[in-house]
Amino acid sequence: MSKSKKTTKKTTEEYIKEFFENLSIETSFEMEEAEEEIRLTLETQDSGMIIGYHGETLDALQLILALVLAKKQGAFKRVSIEVGDYKKNREEWLRKLASDAKEKAVSQSREVILEELKPWERRIIHLILAQDDEVVSESSGEGRERVLVVRPK
């Protein structure tokens, strides 16, 4: 690893540590930094507070941390935080949702609309169904009205 890469990673870790300290959240974390994304796995007693209602607080923290890091480092990277296995469990639920939507679309020969999904959740379902020969998925609508549509091919 080059010296500048090492320095950047250390600096990123320091900014993240400072971010959580400023919020009075005691946590330790592991960080993976890729070209377009920073992934954090948090260990904390405050996981419920960090996740919030339906993950809304977690989504907000990810965005705010990404913006803070972009301001400090001059480049925007998406931040993904895993805490209390929330995302892992949510992904398992999304896999089941995708499977059920596919089954319904194929068996009833009609489109199935999945509402109230966050952008990252729609992305996961799109990736799951992209490999499927029987259905196609697409997002439709704008903003909070955006839905995911699963239809037979």
Language-model-derived ranges and their functions:
Residues 1-153:
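RNA-contacting regions in translation and RNA-metabolism proteins
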